Amino acid sequence: MGLVGFVPVANAQIVLDFSDDLANQNFFTDNPVARAAVEAAAADINAAIVFDLSAAEDITTGTAGTTSFDFDFVYNYSNPATGEQQIIEDASSPENVYRIFVGVRTLGGSALGFGGAGGTGFAGSGTLGSGSLADAVADAEANDTHRRGGGPLVITLNGAFEDGTPFSFEVGLGVGSVVFDDDANWHFDHTVPVAPGANDFYSVALHEILHTLGVGGTDSWNSMIVGTTWLGAEVIASHGTGTGIVESDGEHFAENLMSPRITDGVLQEIVLDPNLTVGTRKGLTQLDLAVLRDLGFQTNDFDPILLGDVNLDGFVNFLDISPFISVLSAGGTLAEADVNQDGAVNFLDISPFIGVLAGQ
């Protein structure tokens, strides 16, 4: 499979692959602002996660005496541009890289997007010799690299050969895919406030990329759920309880669950609940990161930025006006002055700055 449209972001952790889109709708080439929003969402997640994924080799070999057996793994995922299952014959992955295929198509209904981790399978072949097949399989299980160390357990491949010899392989993150609805009323530009009545593309990208990281349907996720109760210690420590906070669909957290945003500490509906209010934008919250820790990731610590506190006294008030003007005039990069959080301090920050001064 070619990697046309392969885009590494933020230290080559999550890597976005637009090749399926390029071969079909070519939506993201024609809509660079939408592409920038997806890349920003991936970069923000990369900044939050400490990736510790070991490299995965395509073929796992086990030996016992002169008996040798190969397990040739494959990855599969839902092609975001067509909805068809796509097979990747070479199931190898570089260290600390997780590839996500991104595309658009008409989804129907009210769905704005879908995201998820891909699947895994293998074909077995070998030569029987002086050792037992069971010992060769056990050696292959010990040698296999597809668990990848950190992150969630996506699936465990269990079974037995015709002679009854059992096998079991734990598989972590291989590839994932994200698809967006192509006819929703979207707001694409993540650097400006969301237009009234529009769905924020960045927020949906953030949500769906988290699904590819093991949220919903993976073995690690399922091990944390009993009914609507979450069992993970990190979420319980962050929220105070795990009771009644899982949505009935078993794929999300409950609607309207609130947590402090990691950038500024403001309470916000978490990214991993099932709904997005039109005309609004979400950012990662402390509870979203707690979920990722329960799924096997390490996350970075964040000191929330008080947007508008340009004089850094812990308050936003009239005393920040003169410093804000100075930073603005100098084209500075002070994070507290970048009120619209687009990575630059310029005239686009003036209206948001006035808003935070007014307590909006």
Label for each model-derived stretch:
Residues 1-12:
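Sec-dependent, cleavable N-terminal signal peptides
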Residues 7, 162, 189, 240, ...:
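Compositionally biased, intrinsically disordered low-complexity regions enriched in proline and serine
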Residues 7, 265, 277-280, 309, ...:
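Preference for short coil/turn "hinge" residues that link or interrupt alpha-helices
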Residues 11-206, 211-304:
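Extracellular zinc-dependent metalloprotease catalytic-domain scaffold
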Residues 292, 300-360:
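Cellulosome-associated attachment modules in secreted, modular CAZymes
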